[in-house]
């Protein structure tokens, strides 16, 4: 082992915890499609042969939750008992009730409105207390840490070669892990280790799997990154066999992959999961907003690394605190960058929802392969549209 080695992991959409995330977000999307003002908090548990969906909801629409669950499982690829789980025949239990009126009153009429404010953005209070972080760095062109970006792309490619028939013996469950060497200036310099585990059918030998995965998944992905990878250590299915997988191998639960969902451990995390939550829940919307903030700080050239924290009190619109840190990479003081952030970004929940257009059925797409670093049209928090305003506000 040489150098300073940082590691991040990802999982495929067929990992049990990720199936749970995708089910929760698919239910959320179905409700938002019928009623964009739906309040949704949905959790999913799945194990051998059964799925349980529970939570609290306020909506004017009717959603056939069992149908949403089955369609998502089948789309992921669990469509036969031969694979250990079958969306056609698995049991689906639904236990969804109404949202607490005590919570609703604080969200519907924020503390500021109740104490005299007439600003429309003060009307909606935060759906809970809590702290959320956003992060960005210049490791990659999407301003994300390199280890998590490579791990996510490997997981995506592993799924792609399964679904398009390139490697038909693969099954949906899988994990990736990437170790990158960093130099003394925190710059990525070399791929050190790649770990990839993939569920497969009964008849596939490890030597075949390793050769195929290296050829069709790992080497093509590594070739897209401008960092040396010659001589990297490769570990494919280190247990030697991965036939039993998915919910048959491990129970899955919504919100169990919060580091995979974010920055691969390179940044702090407030602890709140995303999936199954509508944007009135600041666990989700404010984390997206702080990614937007941090990415724009780096895109503006104010720093090469930025982490931004925001915190809320339940029922209150204005954050109780904001903290911006650039780890010594800022071109001006962190305090000045923080002042610029507060001048350019409105971090009240209603303003975040408005500015990022979050009342849309976009969330199932976020639930696998990372909420950040994928510059898709729906991922409005990946825009760098405030970079010029930040530079001006910082006096540059």
From Swiss-Prot:
Sites binding K(+) sit at 43
Q: Biological process GO terms, please?
A: one-carbon metabolic process; S-adenosylmethionine biosynthetic process
Q: Show the catalytic activity.
A: L-methionine + ATP + H2O = S-adenosyl-L-methionine + phosphate + diphosphate
Gene Ontology cellular component list: cytoplasm
Keywords assigned by UniProt, alphabetized: ATP-binding, Cytoplasm, Magnesium, Metal-binding, Nucleotide-binding, One-carbon metabolism, Potassium, Transferase
User: Where can this protein be found?
Assistant: Cytoplasm
Cofactor comment text: Binds 2 divalent ions per subunit.
**Binding of Mg(2+), residues:** 17
Q: Where does L-methionine bind?
A: 56, 99, 250, 281
> Which segments carry the region annotation Flexible loop?
99-109
* Stored CDD domains: S-AdoMet_synt
What pathway does this protein act in?
Amino-acid biosynthesis; S-adenosyl-L-methionine biosynthesis; S-adenosyl-L-methionine from L-methionine: step 1/1
Enzyme Commission code: 2.5.1.6
Coiled-coil zones = none
Which HAMAP family does this UniProt record tie to the protein?
S_AdoMet_synth1 (MF_00086)
Q: Which family does it belong to?
A: Belongs to the AdoMet synthase family.
Q: Which PANTHER family match?
A: S-ADENOSYLMETHIONINE SYNTHETASE
Tell me how this protein assembles: Homotetramer; dimer of dimers.
Q: Which NCBIfam families match?
A: metK
What does the record give as the function of this protein? Answer: Catalyzes the formation of S-adenosylmethionine (AdoMet) from methionine and ATP. The overall synthetic reaction is composed of two sequential steps, AdoMet formation and the subsequent tripolyphosphate hydrolysis which occurs prior to release of AdoMet from the enzyme.
User: Which protein are we looking at?
Assistant: S-adenosylmethionine synthase
Species of provenance: Nocardioides sp. (strain ATCC BAA-499 / JS614)
Gene name of this polypeptide = metK
């Amino acid at each position: 082992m040489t150098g300073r080695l940082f590691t991040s992991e990802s999982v495929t959409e067929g990992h049990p915890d990720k199936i749970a995330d995708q089910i929760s977000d698919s239910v959320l999307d179905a409700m938002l499609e019928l009623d964009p003002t739906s309040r949704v908090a949905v959790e999913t548990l799945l194990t051998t042969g059964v799925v349980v969906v529970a939570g609290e909801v306020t909506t004017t629409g009717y959603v056939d939750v069992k149908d949403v669950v089955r369609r998502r499982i089948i789309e992921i690829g669990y469509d036969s008992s031969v694979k250990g789980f079958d969306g056609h025949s698995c049991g689906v239990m639904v236990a969804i009730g109404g949202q607490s009126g005590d919570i609703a009153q604080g969200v519907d009429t924020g503390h500021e409105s109740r104490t005299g404010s007439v600003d429309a953005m003060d009307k909606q209070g935060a759906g809970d207390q809590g702290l959320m972080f956003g992060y960005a760095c210049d490791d990659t062109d999407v301003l994300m840490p390199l280890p998590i970006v490579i791990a996510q792309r490997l997981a995506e490619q592993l799924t792609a070669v399964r679904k398009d028939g390139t490697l038909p013996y693969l099954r949906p469950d899988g994990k990736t892990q990437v170790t990158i060497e960093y130099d003394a200036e925190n710059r990525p310099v070399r791929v050190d280790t790649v770990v990839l585990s993939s569920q497969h059918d009964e008849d596939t030998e490890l030597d075949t799997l390793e050769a195929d995965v290296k050829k069709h998944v790992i080497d093509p992905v590594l070739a897209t990154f401008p960092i040396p990878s010659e001589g990297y250590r490769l570990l494919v299915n280190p247990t030697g066999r991965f036939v039993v997988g998915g919910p048959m191998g491990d129970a899955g639960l919504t919100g169990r992959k919060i580091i995979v969902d974010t920055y691969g451990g390179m940044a702090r995390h407030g602890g709140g999961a995303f999936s199954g939550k509508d944007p009135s829940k600041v666990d989700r919307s404010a984390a997206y907003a702080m990614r937007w903030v941090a990415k724009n700080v780096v895109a503006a050239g104010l720093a090469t690394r930025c982490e931004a924290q925001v915190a809320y009190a339940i029922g209150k619109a204005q954050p109780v605190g904001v903290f911006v840190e650039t780890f010594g990479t800022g071109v001006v003081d962190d305090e000045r960058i923080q002042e610029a952030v507060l001048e350019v970004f409105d971090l009240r929940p209603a303003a975040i929802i408005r500015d990022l257009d979050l009342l849309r059925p976009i969330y199932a797409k976020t639930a696998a392969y990372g909420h950040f670093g994928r510059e898709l049209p729906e991922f409005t928090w990946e825009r760098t549209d405030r970079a010029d305003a930040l530079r001006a506000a910082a006096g540059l």
